């Protein structure tokens, strides 16, 4: 994602955005991910590790279902106090049973933000942790997967960061962002591959 694209999702000057974000092509759970938070009334970038680690879970939790997160203690406090914007310009889902990877973008390839929540780091030297909120698949995603990341409309960004009551109303309605998709090559299946080849259409 370029600094010009990032200006769409924030009020920060381009010089600051260039320092914050670099292009990524294949981000996987447990990796470090930049996100935007609101601190003291200012938008700030923070680096997070993807996946909450509650004491009762052997493995990190990488997403939270919009339909039930307010009923789950693991997510309740982060949702009320620590919401974030996770910038992206696309995401991947894998179609079963052949596990064909598909990339989803907006029709005009504009960047967008996933709805995220975060929690404190497990130790002073660690990064804070976050999860992406998911929702039922839109018509464009449904042929590939039953779920998808919750994509916020640009008009919802400020409310998502500032008001937990309105944020709850936002995720109570399925994401309305229009998407398109195309199959990509198995190159994206390997987490270590984080390069432009991940975006190339299959065939």
Language-model regions, residue ranges each:
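Short linear sequence motif anchored by a di-proline
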Residues: 1-203
């Amino acid at each position: 994602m370029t600094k010009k694209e990032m200006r769409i999702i924030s009020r920060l000057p381009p010089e600051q955005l260039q320092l914050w974000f670099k292009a990524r092509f294949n981000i996987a759970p447990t990796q470090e991910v930049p996100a935007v938070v609101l601190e003291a009334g200012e938008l700030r970038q923070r680096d997070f590790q993807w996946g909450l680690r509650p004491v009762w879970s052997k493995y990190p939790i990488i997403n939270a279902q919009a339909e039930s997160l307010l009923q789950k203690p693991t997510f309740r406090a982060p949702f009320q106090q620590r919401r974030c914007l996770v910038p992206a310009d696309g995401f991947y889902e894998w179609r079963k049973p052949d596990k064909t990877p598909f990339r989803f973008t907006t029709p005009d390839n504009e960047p967008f933000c996933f709805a995220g929540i975060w929690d404190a780091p497990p130790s002073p030297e660690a990064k804070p942790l976050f999860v992406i909120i998911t929702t039922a698949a839109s018509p464009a995603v449904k042929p590939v997967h039953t779920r998808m990341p919750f994509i916020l409309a640009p008009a919802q960004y400020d409310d998502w960061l500032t008001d937990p009551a309105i944020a709850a109303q936002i995720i109570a309605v399925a994401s309305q962002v229009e998407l398109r998709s195309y199959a990509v090559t198995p190159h994206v299946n390997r987490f270590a591959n984080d390069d432009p080849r991940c975006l190339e259409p299959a065939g």
